[in-house]
């Protein structure tokens, strides 16, 4: 099979496209012929090996996590899928998705609704689940609460804006100039262009603080913007070469103050949850969630440049929606329902 191979940690120079043996699904796994893949921040960290703590996972020969496709073969002990099923899911940190075939744990995939495209489905697993779980972590968002999303134009951010609105929240999105209108189109009540206005100034203009802040960029100190009982969910990992520093950023609150404070902070460790993926796909089917497809490419040979380019723009904070690659060689069944 044709696959993307990663030779080491770094940039584009560590990626190539070559022929590799097609995997055989082991017990509890499913072999999927890939229709589309998406790229997210985790792929960036696994390519660059930064922060260094990500290197503890090890180097995956084939990178990539999130995919959609058709079940080709099931491994021993798999009873809930059969050859021909249209599915989407993730390999999580095990990688392997950037190939014509991927072997993934059956517990990490769900059926794709006919009305959800291959490209949309491939974008849902990690980014969609991260957004949903961030909004539910600690004290779940309730109707009427004020939520700020830093990094609102990113893959996770575009989901988070819409999901927070669906929960009845008043949403402020923070993004760069070129993405302001897009974030507003997703339903954000207030959009702050961090290039021209500080978030602090925008909050003062509103004369309000926030019940929950979702930080997808890791660039501000948020304590002064939280309500007395507000909470911060930190999703972004700092690009630090110091493993203790990264661990401290996870364990220690970016907004922690004295022990008397009732403000809470959480470092999100996203968990693969099939029920969340099914919920997200259902919202897309019902027209209540839009997958923002930013860069759309076709063919596995596009993956190395797309992954390297995603890493560059992620570091610069300029993400716009999801990067998705459709694979040219699709089974005849791979048409949108």
Task: Give the residues covered by each predicted segment.
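C-terminal hydrophobic helical "lid"/dimerization subdomain
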Residues: 271-337
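Glycine-rich beta-strand-centered segment in the early N-terminal region that forms part
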Residues: 21-38, 50-94, 216
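Glycine-rich cofactor phosphate-binding loops and adjacent beta1-alpha1 units
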Residues: 172, 190-265, 333
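NAD(P)H dinucleotide-binding glycine-rich loop of Rossmann-like/cofactor-binding domains
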Residues: 45, 65, 73, 80, ...
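Mid-domain Rossmann-like dinucleotide-binding core that forms the NAD(H)/NADP(H) cofactor-binding site
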Residues: 122-196
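Short, glycine/polar-rich helix-capping loops at beta-to-alpha or helix-loop-helix junctions
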Residues: 97-99, 176-182, 277
């Amino acid at each position: 099979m044709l696959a993307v191979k990663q030779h080491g940690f770094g940039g584009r120079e560590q990626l190539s496209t070559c022929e590799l043996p097609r995997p055989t699904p082991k017990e509890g796994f499913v072999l999927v012929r890939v229709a589309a893949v998406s790229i997210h921040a985790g792929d960036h960290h696994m390519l660059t090996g930064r922060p260094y703590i990500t290197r503890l996972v090890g180097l995956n020969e084939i990178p990539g996590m999130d995919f959609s496709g058709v079940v080709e073969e099931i491994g021993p002990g798999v009873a809930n899928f059969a050859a021909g099923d249209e599915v989407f899911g993730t390999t999580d940190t095990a990688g392997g998705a950037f190939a014509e075939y991927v072997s993934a744990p059956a517990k990490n995939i769900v059926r794709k609704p006919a009305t959800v495209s291959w490209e949309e489905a491939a974008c849902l697993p990690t980014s969609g689940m991260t957004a949903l779980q961030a909004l539910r972590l600690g004290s779940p968002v309730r109707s009427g609460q004020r939520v700020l999303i830093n990094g609102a134009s990113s893959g996770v951010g575009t989901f988070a804006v819409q999901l927070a609105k669906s929960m009845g929240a008043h949403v402020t999105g923070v993004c760069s100039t070129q993405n302001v209108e897009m974030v507003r189109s997703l339903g954000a009540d207030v959009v702050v262009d961090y290039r021209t206005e500080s978030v602090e100034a925008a909050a003062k203009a509103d004369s309000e603080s926030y019940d929950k802040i979702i930080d997808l960029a890791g660039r501000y100190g948020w304590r002064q913007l939280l309500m007395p009982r507000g909470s911060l969910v930190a999703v972004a990992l700092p690009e630090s070469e110091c493993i203790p520093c990264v661990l401290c950023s996870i364990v220690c609150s970016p907004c922690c103050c004295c022990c008397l404070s009732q403000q809470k902070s959480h470092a999100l460790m996203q968990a693969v949850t099939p029920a969340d993926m099914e919920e997200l796909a259902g919202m897309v089917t019902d027209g209540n969630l839009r997958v923002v497809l930013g860069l759309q490419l076709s063919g596995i040979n596009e993956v190395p440049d797309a992954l390297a380019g995603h890493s560059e723009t992620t570091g610069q904070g300029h993400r716009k929606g999801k990067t998705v690659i459709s694979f040219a060689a699709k089974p005849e069944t791979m048409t949108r329902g």
